[in-house]
Amino acid sequence: CLVVSLALCVGCLFYYKYFNFLGETLAALLDSFGLHYTAPSLDILAPVGISYFTFAALGYVIDVYRGRQRAEKNFFFYALFVSFFPCIVTGPIERAEHMIPQFKTPQTFDYARVSGGLFRILWGFFKKFVIANTLGTAVDAVYGNPGYGAYTGPILLLASLLYTYQLYCDFSAGCDVALGAGAVFGFELTENFRQPLHARSFTELWRRWHISLTSWFRDYLYIPLGGNRRGKARQYINQLVVFLVSGLWHGASLSMVVWGLLNGVYLCVGKATQDARRKLTRHNPLYHFTPVRRIFQTAVTYLLFTSCIIFFRSSEVFEGSKGIADALYI
């Protein structure tokens, strides 16, 4: 029963989101060896939010199998959980144990909750239409220009840094609207972003960025693969696998695969060099000055994350790599 349920969920996601991508990738790979292959292509429109509600459904099936969640006998409560409209476009990815009991609890009007929810919605709209769109205009003036290669390194670097903040505002704004809408209807949703761009390490950043997705991968992929229980090498491999899948979840393209793997590499390198970096900075008096240390750590984390985010905007791996090289004068 578990295998059938997982196959149905993953099969639907593969059919709608990854069939064409894998066919095109296989064709390109064979062409590089001089073998001509025409990949079949499906002219289909994927359901809105398929990545989100598929993961919600997968989490439910696995939790029921593990005994963490009772199988819901009322189909309508299950359907409401999987397709709860505030969550299916930008998340958060909720768990059945968190949402279904709320659906079954009678709701009463709470002025503070409703007004707080409406304010959260307005804040989300402000972040999206004022902050993100304004930053997007500046970023598009550089990266949206076919001749953007003529720009100097500092301009490209500034555009890249702004794009990271634009993406954060864009993405978190959708979650703000979702959480606000949930509050208006009487439901508490999971916080998905906790000021991730203020993080001082890559590990901390991924504890604050897209929290519901990160925790989903931790519980349903990273830990089942062995987590950190089988030695350092296996831990790093597991982390790379998780971020590879995360990249594919965000988008069916090679640039998203690179985005995921690059995040995983930074995370692994950061953990592998943690002790060495502490020894290196132990005798630096400036580094012991807390404000300087915090600013430096936050700036480095932001820059590294930006080098990943460039692939989010790029349709091709080469384009993303060129953007990084140009920004650094390479």
Residue ranges of each PLM-predicted region?
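Membrane-embedded transmembrane alpha-helical bundles that form the catalytic cores
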Residues: 1-330
